């Protein structure tokens, strides 16, 4: 393994100034962390230790927010001082049967959605409930793509909250 590591480092350093050279420390195991990845977007100066924030997730009919897919559930909690102070959980009726792969993935069925409101109304209620608070989600870009598309599709105000991605 050392000869392979040596060759990789030698090729990486080729043509770089000496102060930018990478040096291997043989006999150690290191983990490289990509600290350049953006985990926050639409950022404002929010300190989650001192503010109320929302943790949320969406379930959808598929993976294409800009295509035929849409949200089928928005679930969220408001957190203040480390405690849940409020909850939001609404199913959304997509007006068509769910694909079986989505039923298998989410355990949400057509029967669950039968009496649910439409995407426009649920999204509007969610925006009002979130009231501009910072938002936290795992794989937030996916969830926000559906929220943003719903806002655009139904003429709702643009969602401009700070968003933090835990992925």
Set out the residue ranges of the language-model regions.
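Phosphodiester-processing cores and adjacent nucleic acid-binding clamps
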Residues: 1-59, 78, 129, 140-141, ...
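Conserved non-catalytic scaffold segment of RNase H-like nuclease domains
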Residues: 49-160
């Amino acid at each position: 393994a050392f000869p392979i590591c040596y060759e990789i480092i030698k090729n990486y350093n080729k043509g770089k100034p000496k102060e930018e050279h990478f040096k291997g420390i043989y006999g150690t195991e290191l983990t490289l962390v990509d600290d350049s990845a953006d985990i926050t977007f639409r950022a404002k100066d929010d300190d989650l230790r001192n503010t109320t924030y929302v943790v949320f997730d969406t379930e959808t009919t598929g993976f294409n927010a800009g295509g035929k897919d849409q949200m089928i559930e928005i679930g969220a909690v408001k957190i203040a001082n480390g405690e849940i102070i409020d909850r939001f959980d609404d199913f959304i009726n997509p007006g068509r049967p769910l694909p079986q792969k989505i039923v298998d993935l989410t355990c949400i069925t057509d029967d669950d959605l039968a009496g649910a409101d439409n995407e426009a109304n649920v999204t509007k209620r969610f925006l009002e409930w979130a009231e501009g608070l910072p938002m936290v989600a795992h794989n937030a870009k996916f969830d926000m793509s559906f929220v943003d598309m719903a806002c655009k599709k139904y003429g709702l105000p643009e969602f401009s909250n700070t968003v933090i991605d835990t992925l």
